[in-house]
């Protein structure tokens, strides 16, 4: 037995790198500051949540940045262990295993502070010019009202252009994800410009949930999904998830963030 021990230790030493590599989760992702970005040390709010959830389950994570469409296609083909982070859709539920909710995006209405925007229902916005990004889903009700002519919209290329239109008074209201707005204002506008804008505390919808996608054909996908969901539950129950979600600074004087919601309790988002 004494002679077998050195051989056993040698074999274990050879196996250890492969065993460690098997615990590393390779994740395809893209740029969407502040949620997913190479410009932040933590790689963004959403990716930090993904990293910490896997870490609590004993996995190391490596993120690989690429165009979003490529990330989804290559993950579907099984070239990556997972892709983060994505909205739910019927097609993605057919193509992938979807995790529990990573985070609920906070879509709110930004306006010039001087107009003192108040609203209870979308119909209340009928007298304002609303900036919209054509490729965004928003909500089915929102688009029904637009098609019925009950909301006035102005097409714009992206969120940054929408914020600039607000300051130029070319639009009155911009639906935008709260943390995306905060990040853009911090990086592209002066404090004086940001101070001209207000955000209404009411959420446009509470169902913009986002998820980790895993290819169902890979042998370990089901185990990784279970491990991730377990780690995510720990992250939420410990309060760390909520702390990560508040890591983006917003302009002074903005309305308080909406009350935290249980990410597992909301419905699906339709777009990434």
Where does each model-flagged region fall?
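Extended ligand-binding regions for polar small-molecule ligands
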Residues: 47-56, 210-244
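Ligand-binding cleft/hinge of the Venus flytrap
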Residues: 48-59, 100-101, 124-126, 135-157, ...
